[in-house]
Amino acid sequence: MAKKKSDQFEEALKKLQDIVEKLERGDMPLEEAMEAFSEGIRLARVCHGKLEEAERKVRILLKEQEGDWTTSPFEPASGEPPGG
């Protein structure tokens, strides 16, 4: 059975967090650290792609007062700058 996209994101994010923790400890041999770094970059791209996909979906149809449907861009409420 195929995994849900949210499961794929959560799994990739967990693996990425594990890799970051291992790299931050600084006790990996260089070759292993380089492989982990490469895998981390790949996972970061997967997560970024999933987040972009989610953002596109958040550009949901909003019903205006007149009953018309319109799209509205996603505006983060956190006050963080875009990409940050």
Swiss-Prot record:
It holds the Pfam family Exonuc_VII_S. One of its GO terms (cellular component) is cytosol. It is an enzyme of class 3 (hydrolase). It comes from the Bacteria. InterPro entries: Exonuc_VII_S, Exonuc_VII_ssu_sf. The keyword Hydrolase applies. It catalyses: Exonucleolytic cleavage in either 5'- to 3'- or 3'- to 5'-direction to yield nucleoside 5'-phosphates. Residues 65-84 are annotated as: Disordered. Gene3D superfamilies: Exonuclease VII, small subunit (1.10.287.1040). Keywords: Cytoplasm, Exonuclease, Hydrolase, Nuclease. It is found in: Cytoplasm. Its EC number is 3.1.11.6. GO terms for biological process: DNA catabolic process. GO terms for molecular function: exodeoxyribonuclease VII activity. Bidirectionally degrades single-stranded DNA into large acid-insoluble oligonucleotides, which are then degraded further into small acid-soluble oligonucleotides. Heterooligomer composed of large and small subunits. Belongs to the XseB family. This is Exodeoxyribonuclease 7 small subunit. The gene is xseB.
